[in-house]
Amino acid sequence: MVLAQSRVSAGVGSPHCSGSGGGGSDYFPWPASHPGNPQCSFSTAFLASPRLSRGTLAYLPPALWSSLATPSALLGSSCAPPPPPARCPQPRALSPELGTKAGPRRPHRWELPRSPSQGAQGPAPRRRLMETMKGIVAASGSETEDEDSMDIPLDLSSSAGSGKRRRRGNLPKESVQILRDWLYEHRYNAYPSEQEKALLSQQTHLSTLQVCNWFINARRRLLPDMLRKDGKDPNQFTISRRGAKISETSSVESVMGIKNFMPALEETPFHSCTAGPNPTLGRPLSPKPSSPGSVLARPSVICHTTVTALKDVPFSLCQSVGVGQSTDIQQIAANNFTDTSLMYPEDTCKSGPSTNTQSGLFNTPPPTPPDLNQDFSGFQLLVDVALKRAAEMELQAKLTA
């Protein structure tokens, strides 16, 4: 307002004033002068003054422009100076951030909207705006700082936590001595259980994880020297990935050693047999006694057969009788043995067959308790099958004859 009034006073005393309207500038349509009222010609002289540029006129608010364009409204009947408008918005020439186009002023994107009462107060709204912006920035900065502080413990990357990583420290000497003593006492099995780890954790005032890590490192670094001082091989008392092949070979050797003992255990009942031919496993089993008296009667053994496991060759332990038995017993035995899938059909040993119970070979309960001198070896099973088959073939030959 002050700038506009100074411009008006400068235009009145200007020697370049002319009473004709519409002169000076062709940017705005200038109103015509009033010849009946020569005192009002200063308005047109002000508008036609060359001191007013287009930019200055462009910065004039619409309310001031309307008051200048209508002298009757500006001066009244007595052409008195116009009263300063109380609610007139601030001229645009005082705000450098605004454009040069005429029209209503638009607020900046970071500027709060002005009320009409704030127009004449000067830069006070801007100060409040700056204070408000500082508060917003401070609040956002505090929030980001809080978020950053919350993210710091969760960041496990080496680049982010390198500056705040703690320096590596050693365990207390008392705790290390307790762990060393336990390791030396259990050097042949240096693998503490969960209860022992908890006890050591209480004694050393360390966490269970620290105790576990210490033993992992001690078994790799300290334990081999302890075992070598005792003259022991460390690979036999530690479980490591490097010694996995050695442990596998030792386990294979132990398994092979167990297998080597199995034939000896199987051969022991063969030598304790009191009757039967030569127990040589590599030869075909075809016992042929030289005389009828050489066949000794073995104790009675009940017939039990595992049909599901051995379907083709059912083994049975049966009673062997002498040659001088009656023929009616032989015919009863011939009726019982009808299986033709038995092996060793070429054996023609003259031996009496064995008698069986009612249901034959299928897990029948024993009619009498077995004797103490039973022989369940595999060799005797084969001998019994051969003798049984030979007796069956002999009976068939007699019946056909």
Swiss-Prot record:
Chain positions covered by the region annotation Disordered: 1-20, 78-127, 139-170
Domain of life: Eukaryota
GO biological process: negative regulation of transcription by RNA polymerase II
GO CC entries: nucleus
Tagged with keyword Nucleus: yes
SUPFAM superfamilies: Homeodomain-like
DNA-binding region positions on the chain: 164-226
Assigned keywords, A-Z: DNA-binding, Homeobox, Nucleus, Repressor, Transcription, Transcription regulation
Major localisation: nucleus
Motif CTBP-binding motif in this chain: 153-157
Known function: Binds to a retinoid X receptor (RXR) responsive element from the cellular retinol-binding protein II promoter (CRBPII-RXRE). Inhibits the 9-cis-retinoic acid-dependent RXR alpha transcription activation of the retinoic acid responsive element. Active transcriptional corepressor of SMAD2. Links the nodal signaling pathway to the bifurcation of the forebrain and the establishment of ventral midline structures. May participate in the transmission of nuclear signals during development and in the adult, as illustrated by the down-modulation of the RXR alpha activities.
PANTHER family named in the record: HOMEOBOX PROTEIN TRANSCRIPTION FACTORS
Subunit structure: Interacts with SMAD2. Interacts with CTBP, SMAD3 and HDAC1.
Protein name (database record): Homeobox protein TGIF1
